[in-house]
């Protein structure tokens, strides 16, 4: 990566929210923390989106608590990578898409944009499917109508944005805590064995030696580090009003943005653990192989003998509510990430409503097409989630490597460049994740062909 500096005529990242939320570096630490509380919530959404649910609950249902260790390691890795995106955004004033475009020729930048766009579409497909299925389960709305309803999220987002980015953060936070409290309640009712749960955080050799466990473990890792989150986080941390030319203020901004990120990712870690624990405590050693998708999980909760008819109905309904909340959350963040990628790579200047409508439509159209082709077959639509995870796996190195190269560049980052230990860990992570994702892609296609 060469040492070109950020050009002064570069468009601000998400310019309608950039530098709009007050941050006073002279205020108390508590006030600074509260000022930066928010961007991490939007990032945490990607770590507990509907695409993660199936993997976590299947992992628990099929292999008990063994994979809790994998969720722990994945979450710690995510914290490191997201902290790097925070430093990139605040230190340079560029988001990851702008930075990548800045250092690439236009033809190569377009290739990177296509890959990033496919990753966001793949992420968004999971949210559209999750929301449509939740609406179907709760209100018996046909899947195709439910998918079309999700397009309205764009206009809701535009309406809320008029009242400031803080309102978006508050709504996302409300949805996150709705999901969190639902699963705390569901896990409490399912009465897991505490010793077995704690033992799950200890590494077991079967994770590597057992092909079935390894496959689910790779799915958890692949679904945890989300490409769109790296683009999103590097942009939305710039919504605060720290001085763009004062390293002391930048250092404070990085500190409190990283604290915010780590707290919110810890919540996402807890939610993913709860999903796995719920799957293990209710379905391990029973009908685990039948838990193929959202419908299976919903009906399994509803008819689980341990819960009884009344509690089963409550648990399954709450599951659908949580799925809807998670899907709505992810559509907000996915749409914002799509805008960041389109602006950063292509430098397009089009109206916000049109840009967001294009981004949303790119995700909804494949779902609608599949619903029409397969005549609303839920199983086929859930299989679309498998392909979406493959796209995410392919896209990951294309954002991780530019992030690593940029944040280790002293000329670009100034005093905020990566320390040696960060470079060692992040390069190790990138290599391991890339190898695991290639393996996951091969395994996925073998599964589909068999």
UniProtKB/Swiss-Prot annotation:
One of its GO terms (cellular component) is plasma membrane. It is found in: Cell membrane. Keywords: Cell membrane, Ion transport, Membrane, Symport, Transmembrane, Transmembrane helix, Transport. It is a multi-pass membrane protein. One of its GO terms (biological process) is iron ion transmembrane transport. The chain crosses the membrane at residues 34-54, 61-81, 108-128, 141-161, 170-190, 212-232, 263-283, 305-325, 361-381, 383-403, 422-442. The keyword Transport applies. GO terms for molecular function: cadmium ion transmembrane transporter activity; manganese ion transmembrane transporter activity; metal ion binding; symporter activity. H(+)-stimulated, divalent metal cation uptake system. Belongs to the NRAMP family. This is Divalent metal cation transporter MntH. It comes from Staphylococcus aureus (strain Mu3 / ATCC 700698).
